[in-house]
Amino acid sequence: MTTAAIIVAAGRGTRAGGDLPKQWQPLAGRPVLAHTLAAFRAAAGVSRTLLVIHPDDRARAEALPGVAEGKVELVEGGASRDASVRNALEALAGAGIERVLIHDGARPLVAPGLIARTLAALESAPGAAPAVPVSDALWRGEGGRVVGTQDRTGLFRAQTPQAFRYEAILAAHRAHPGGAADDVEVARAAGLEVAIVEGCEDNLKVTYPGDFARAERLLALAAGL
């Protein structure tokens, strides 16, 4: 089956600190996005890779490995995350794509096995996404004080890549009014079932300064350093 990967990297997040959005900050000597793209370019069965960028980042994006050679296609993002994903989905229309992976550009440590088992879950459902069960105690707070606890039974921390049958998620995005937190929300609004796939604690989203140090340690371990 023909599969495309959409890497969403049009955000301007600043919680990581620094002068650049987190996906463009250096990680082990390369931009975060370079690691993310390498994972999908190496993934079995992915025939096209689309990188969704902010218009201001085009020069940076053109310098990434794979872009100049045409192995990574650039798509300009929209005013929101779901609009950015929709732009990429529309760019694939009519290309014979059957499955699509949608991934946060700021998750550079996605493993080949996670990509493979997420795609495999599409055999039994129109959507699939990795997640990790919540294991910590959960509190409700107000005014800086704990005011209650929350049962964590059945709660998961969502990850990406989120995989879908292409035509189903394209139709779901076209029908959605916008404002979704992720593509699972868009899919469920359209009545699509989404299978939960076993996620990975190391598949972190670099969001805060400390995340970069952790990601560098994990990369060093993976390289045997």
UniProtKB/Swiss-Prot annotation:
The keyword Transferase applies. InterPro entries: IspD, IspD/TarI, IspD/TarI_cytidylyltransf_bact, ISPD_synthase_CS, Nucleotide-diphossugar_trans. Coiled coil: none annotated. It catalyses: 2-C-methyl-D-erythritol 4-phosphate + CTP + H(+) = 4-CDP-2-C-methyl-D-erythritol + diphosphate. It comes from the Bacteria. The keyword DNA-binding does not apply. Its EC number is 2.7.7.60. Catalyzes the formation of 4-diphosphocytidyl-2-C-methyl-D-erythritol from CTP and 2-C-methyl-D-erythritol 4-phosphate (MEP). Belongs to the IspD/TarI cytidylyltransferase family. IspD subfamily. This is 2-C-methyl-D-erythritol 4-phosphate cytidylyltransferase. It comes from Cereibacter sphaeroides (strain KD131 / KCTC 12085).
